[in-house]
């Protein structure tokens, strides 16, 4: 989801490759995989890529990634097996560009983004995940999801788009842009590797992603990046699709049903077997045992994902991802005068607490609000994603903010 987090095409290529290199280097250096089996490990690596609205650029991005991955395999790891060298990726077309305003326009956006990852045979996605037209409003209904599935089926079974060799081979425009993206991404990758790799430089990479997203937000706000229905062609007839009412409404009783199911499951299982499996998992995680084997054994004994996660947190602690807010470069621009006035307010600048409750990792909204508040001269408190309600309340008591902003996904805010 690098593009969803703000990555430019160059950053998306480079950071994805850097992450894969870190994983492969760690596997090779562990000594657990015989040298003659490393080709299988390399061939098992797959990527999850985003596809955006800039069709030609997206086609070239995937062709560049295909070429770079093969080069990395041959030159860094000595892979010669042609099948193992293939760039394997699944794709979700870009939800970031879907709009709440005139959401019917999202249909053509989704189709164009799907075409970008399917038309070039040499760089074609192995699997495609399409969002629904109304996901900027909330959770889609089963019918909305079916509509997105039918888009893929029409492409696969009614058109001839998948019947030919790569239709972009020989195009000067495609080849030139592919080369340009590959060279720029290689320079970015070299810089990340010089910093110690993706894992060692995660705070730097996150900061760059936040800065890129801030720049995108500024361009849209200024009208430099056109979004139809949002900053151009904003007049609209009344849409018959239902707007904010045309989303899935989850029955609040479902939560209690799930709790009852877990309670019933735990009451009917062999608790002694679960306890033994949990102890085995804890031992494997604490030592050199196989966490995967212990995890499978726990599942077969009837353990839950919550119990598995509790053991992992007990052994390894809980990772709190960097927010990227403190060091990201903002786009203050016309906010400079406002920031000066805000900082000069009697009693000091307002303090705002930005909080992200829930389990989803879509942090763009919270980050961009935090960046805008910071660039407006406010003091910002933001601890990142996946905060519990109790944690947010405790932070509010401790920090005593003047304003609390909650970033919530899936239309949950409509009930507030």
Name every feature range the model reports, one short phrase each.
Residues 366-416:
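Cofactor-cradling patches in redox/metallo enzymes
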Residues 39-41, 283-289, 338-350, 394-400:
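Glycine-rich phosphate/diphosphate-binding loops that line cofactor/substrate pockets in enzymes
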Residues 121-135, 161-167:
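Short acidic/histidine-rich active-site segments
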Residues 94, 133, 357-358, 385-386, ...:
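Short, ordered loop/turn segments at secondary-structure junctions
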Residues 21-28, 316-347:
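Short N-terminal or domain-adjacent regulatory/targeting segments
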């Amino acid at each position: 989801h690098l593009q969803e987090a703000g990555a430019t095409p160059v950053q998306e290529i480079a950071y994805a490759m850097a992450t894969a290199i870190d994983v492969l280097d760690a596997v090779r250096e562990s000594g657990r995989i015989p040298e003659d089996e490393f080709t299988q490990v390399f061939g098992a690596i797959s990527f999850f890529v985003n596809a955006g609205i800039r069709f030609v650029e997206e086609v070239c991005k995937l062709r560049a990634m295909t070429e770079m991955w093969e080069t990395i395999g041959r030159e860094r790891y000595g892979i010669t097996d042609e099948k193992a060298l293939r760039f394997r990726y699944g794709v979700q077309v870009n939800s970031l560009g879907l709009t709440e305003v005139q959401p019917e326009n999202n249909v053509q956006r989704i189709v164009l983004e799907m075409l970008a990852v399917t038309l070039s045979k040499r760089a074609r996605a192995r699997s495609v995940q399409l969002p629904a037209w109304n996901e900027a409003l909330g959770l889609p209904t089963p019918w909305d999801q079916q509509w997105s599935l039918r888009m893929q089926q029409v492409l696969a079974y009614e058109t001839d788009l998948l019947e030919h060799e790569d239709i972009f081979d020989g195009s000067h425009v495609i080849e030139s842009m592919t080369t340009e993206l590959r060279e720029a991404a290689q320079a970015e990758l070299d810089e990340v590797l010089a910093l110690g790799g993706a894992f060692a430089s995660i705070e730097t990479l996150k900061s760059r992603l936040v800065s890129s997203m801030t720049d995108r937000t500024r361009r849209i706000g200024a009208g430099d990046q056109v979004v139809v229905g949002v900053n151009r062609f904003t007049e609209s007839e009344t849409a018959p699709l239902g707007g904010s009412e045309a989303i899935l409404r989850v029955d609040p009783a479902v939560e209690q049903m799930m709790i009852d199911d877990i309670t019933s499951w735990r009451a009917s299982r062999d608790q002694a077997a679960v306890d033994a499996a949990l102890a085995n998992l804890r031992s494997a995680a604490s030592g050199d045992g196989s966490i995967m084997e212990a995890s499978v054994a726990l599942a077969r004994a009837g353990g839950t994902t919550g119990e598995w996660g509790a053991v992992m947190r007990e052994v390894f602690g809980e990772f709190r991802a960097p927010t990227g807010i403190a060091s990201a470069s903002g786009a203050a621009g016309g906010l400079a005068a406002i920031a000066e006035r805000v900082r000069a307010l009697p009693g000091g600048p307002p303090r705002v607490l930005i909080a992200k409750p829930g389990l989803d990792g879509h942090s763009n909204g919270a980050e961009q609000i935090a960046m805008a508040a910071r660039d407006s001269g406010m003091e910002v408190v933001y601890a990142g994603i996946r905060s519990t309600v109790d944690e947010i309340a405790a932070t509010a008591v401790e920090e005593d903010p003047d304003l609390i902003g909650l970033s919530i996904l899936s239309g949950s805010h409509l009930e507030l």
